[in-house]
Amino acid sequence: METLKITVYIVVTFFVLLFVFGFLSGDPARNPKRKDLE
């Protein structure tokens, strides 16, 4: 049961990190005017 809990925590953390990195990397793509001005 402890192993299952650890696995769930790892999976949740992985998805949260994936979402955060995807949001940060997708931010400039959503705001192209910032890139064009520079």
Curated annotation (Swiss-Prot):
Record's keyword annotation contains Ligase: no
Location relative to the cell: Cellular thylakoid membrane
Protein name: Photosystem II reaction center protein I
The organism's place on the tree of life at top rank: Bacteria
InterPro entries: PSII_PsbI, PSII_PsbI_sf
Signal peptide annotation: none
Effect of gene knockout: Decreased yields of PSII dimers with increased PSII monomers, slightly slower photoautotrophic growth, about 20% less oxygen evolution. Formed PSII dimers are stable.
